[in-house]
Amino acid sequence: MTRVAIIGAGPSGLAQLRAFQSAGKKGAAIPELVCFEKQSDWGGLWNYTWRTGVDEYGEPVHGSMYRYLWSNGPKECLEFADYSFEEHFGRPIPSYPPRAVLHDYIMGRVEKSDVRKFVRFSTVVRWIDFDETTQLFTVTVKDLKKDELYSETFDYVVVASGHFSTPNVPHFPGIEVFPGRVLHAHDFRDANEFVGKNLLVVGSSYSAEDIASQCYKYGAKSITFSYRSKPLNFDWPECFTVKPLLTKLTGKTAHFKDGSEAVVDAVLLCTGYLHHFPFLADNLRLKTNNRLYPAGLYKGIFWQDNPKLIYLGMQDQYFTFNMFDAQAWYARDVILGRIKLPAAEERQADIDHWRGLEEKLETAFDGIDFQTEYMRDLIPATDYPMFDLDKVAALFKEWEEDKVKSIMGYRDNSYVSIMTGNKAPPHHTKWMEALDDSFDAFQNRPEAAAE
């Protein structure tokens, strides 16, 4: 029997399990599936942990989630085509839920699908290589609870371990003797740590935007952004300052490229993450920066040099959960023989075509349109339910404009579900005033949650 190893039981790995389960439910013979998950439960990054650095087994902590995290994009853009929020919760819910609510939604679909039996928890992958003679992968893993190494062979390997768990940590002169707190966003857990503090946030992408907003919400005294390539051009509150690149630190004084200075109590590095796959042999390892179309992946999924190796969710993302689904359904159908991959030359031509389109992108709207077309390329080849991609793209653009109008208030907006046609109700509490991010507090008005 064909054997498939899936590395990681986060959103991408769970999408792959769900794709096979869906085919099996319709009568298809599916391969033997083994999903290796380092954590003790599934959910990937959406699992919150208080731990930073290493876990209880001495393994690098995977999670980058923090307390009080709310979705920074409309839930309507990430909704599963085969499992709506309304189906899960029994009614429409607001457009910007907190982490616990999104986690519950993700878990709802896979629990209903009965795919937990395929997952080996607390099992970390140590090494994967490929034998050209047998055409099999050898996957060596460690059972963390038993402290035992073992190896198994597989016909296909699906790498679904994500690329937001290994921090990119630049060095700035003087940072090693800075007298305050220095941390990467990967280790950020609680905005209350910075109440009354002057915070320097290095970076200008989504994590910088979100963590800075949260620290302001919970009482930081001031926030200074330092950007390398482009600033976060929003209408920030008065206590925010935007500076060019940090050049050095002397004591508590931060020095910037334009010669200006700021006195800060803490430095938060929102400097991104690395695509890091130390468990893969060099000839199998994806090496890329965070971009919309990584080199070497046919359809953004199949390793060009060996298409029996599959990568899910390795792109920079506008679409998330439903894009992982589109990729997983496509990968499934290749494994099942429903889709025949073309020869290497044709695959490379397709990669070059998409990379050429990516090189021409100039704006966020261009990126949204690019990924929309990517989705349109994948979904019709499978039985994943098609949905109105143009409406999702329009909603992404509306979201971008909403942030420009009110970076602190955009989460109070409501949108129409592309999957059901129903509009989300407003949340009972404005985001700036919603200090409790628990599942119960979100689902119930404050007085009800307190009872």
From Swiss-Prot:
GO molecular function term, any single one: flavin adenine dinucleotide binding
Catalyzed chemical reaction(s): trimethylamine + NADPH + O2 = trimethylamine N-oxide + NADP(+) + H2O
SUPFAM superfamilies listed in its UniProt record: FAD/NAD(P)-binding domain
Binding site for FAD: 12, 37, 39, 45-46, 62, 72, 125, 317, 320
The entry's keywords: FAD, Flavoprotein, Monooxygenase, NADP, Oxidoreductase
Entry annotated with the keyword Cytoplasm: no
Family matches, as PANTHER family: DIMETHYLANILINE MONOOXYGENASE
Protein name: Trimethylamine monooxygenase
